Each structure stands twice: as structure tokens, then as C-alpha cells.
Amino acid sequence: MAAALAVRGAVSAPAFGPEALTPDWENREVSTGTTIMAVQFDGGVVLGADSRTTTGSYIANRVTDKLTPIHDHIFCCRSGSAADTQAVADAVTYQLGFHSIELNEPPLVHTAASLFKEMCYRYREDLMAGIIIAGWDPQEGGQVYSVPMGGMMVRQSFAIGGSGSSYIYGYVDATYREGMTKDECLQFTANALALAMERDGSSGGVIRLAAIQQSGVERQVLLGDQIPKVTISTLPPP
């Protein structure tokens, strides 16, 4: 998952003397990576993510589930520090559950996104968390919200995040079109994630997908031999 940890005020290791033989791992930035995505369609949303969790060059987990349920019809995609995003997701799930009980009705997707925004903004100096919130509610139907690091919130027709997203902005912008069906969104998401996993060394593993509609949540996992092989010849015409 995409994050960076560094010691504040750290100085570089000396070039000479006994200290030069000491590893400077405390001063190095430890990077991790991920690729997450969500797309809105008429009647619901599709979410997707890779499953690799890394710490620098070390792969800590090959089958991480980065699609986290927040409520019955609301999920989030997590990028950043795994510990930070898990803690934030747990806190929002807890608050949203109480909110739903008080109102005696399912929560709105916008409410869930606002809770993420408030927490990510309040603790922006301490958190490494980029979140995509997507789901369905009776008022607005399918919705996708992005809360990047820092706590800004914006609603979008689709959102991508994580270190792998840098490699697929062009593909996503060129390929996305309004009015896609659920199956088209699932294929679109799988293709985009496969492209990111091909280029980003911090993204990999399997592809996890979820489609959320009024009828419920459908989840699927694409294993290695099921991940799309996207080439120039397989791309749709412009």
C-alpha cells in the first residue's frame, strides 16, 4: 500500500569513521505501494484493487484485501499505511453503525465519505491514508468519493489511487465513458488494474473486484491466469 515512513530531523550517515559502517536504515524512506479504483455506473458502483502489500522491496502480503466493507452497501478502497487505513476504516465503520441505528435507516454514501474526510483532515499530519469511498443508497444511487492524503473530498464518476495509478491515468481518461454497464465497468476496472500491476513494482498479486447495487454486493477475485493481458491489439478503438 502506498505510504512513506521517515524519521523527522534525521541526518545522513557520515562518510568516514565507525559510524560509516552503521546501516542508515533509520534514515531511509520506506515506501510501499498499491493500486485502487472505483467506477460509477447506472444503478451502482464497481470497486477494484490489487492485493500486494510492500515495505520497500519486501512483499509483506500477496493477498491483502484492500476493499473494506463500511456498511451493507458502502465499501472503501484503502491506500497508504496499512495500519493507518485500517484504523480509520474501523473508526468510520463504528461511527456509521451508530449513526444508522439512531436514524433507523441505512446511512448515505456521502455521510460515510464525510466521516473519512473529517478524520483524514483532522489527523492529516499523522496519517498516511488515501481512501476511495463507493457505494449505493436510495437517495443518490451509486456514488464514488475520493479522499486523498490531506483530507480533501471530491465526488467523481471514477477514481483511482495508489502508486500504480500514475501508470494508468492516460488509459483511464481515454477509455472511460459515461453510461457503461456493470459488466463493462468490471472489465474496465480489471484492465486498468492489470496495466498498473504490469508497470508498478509495488502493485501485484490478485485482482479483487466488488459490484454494489441495491440488490447487494457481488465480489470476485481474479487469479493470475484470469488477470487480463492488455496489449495494444486488445485496447478498444479511439
Curated annotation (Swiss-Prot):
Primary residence: cytoplasm
Sites bearing Phosphothreonine, chain numbering: T68
PTM-bearing positions, type N-acetylalanine: A2
Enzyme Commission number(s): 3.4.25.1
EC class name: hydrolase
Gene Ontology molecular function terms on file: endopeptidase activity; threonine-type endopeptidase activity
GO biological process, one term: proteasome-mediated ubiquitin-dependent protein catabolic process
Top-rank lineage group of the source organism: Eukaryota
Entry-linked Pfam families: Proteasome
Subcellular location: Cytoplasm; Nucleus
Propeptide: 2-33
PROSITE patterns referenced in this protein's UniProt entry, alphabetically: PROTEASOME_BETA_1, PROTEASOME_BETA_2
Keywords: Acetylation, Cytoplasm, Hydrolase, Nucleus, Phosphoprotein, Protease, Proteasome, Threonine protease, Zymogen
Gene Ontology CC entries for this record: cytoplasm; cytosol; nucleus; proteasome complex; proteasome core complex; proteasome core complex, beta-subunit complex
Active site: T34
Reactions the enzyme catalyzes: Cleavage of peptide bonds with very broad specificity
Quaternary structure and interacting proteins, as annotated: The 26S proteasome consists of a 20S proteasome core and two 19S regulatory subunits. The 20S proteasome core is a barrel-shaped complex made of 28 subunits that are arranged in four stacked rings. The two outer rings are each formed by seven alpha subunits, and the two inner rings are formed by seven beta subunits. The proteolytic activity is exerted by three beta-subunits PSMB5, PSMB6 and PSMB7.
Function of the molecule: Component of the 20S core proteasome complex involved in the proteolytic degradation of most intracellular proteins. This complex plays numerous essential roles within the cell by associating with different regulatory particles. Associated with two 19S regulatory particles, forms the 26S proteasome and thus participates in the ATP-dependent degradation of ubiquitinated proteins.
Family indicated by similarity: Belongs to the peptidase T1B family.
Protein name: Proteasome subunit beta type-6
Source species of the chain: Rattus norvegicus
Chain's gene name: Psmb6
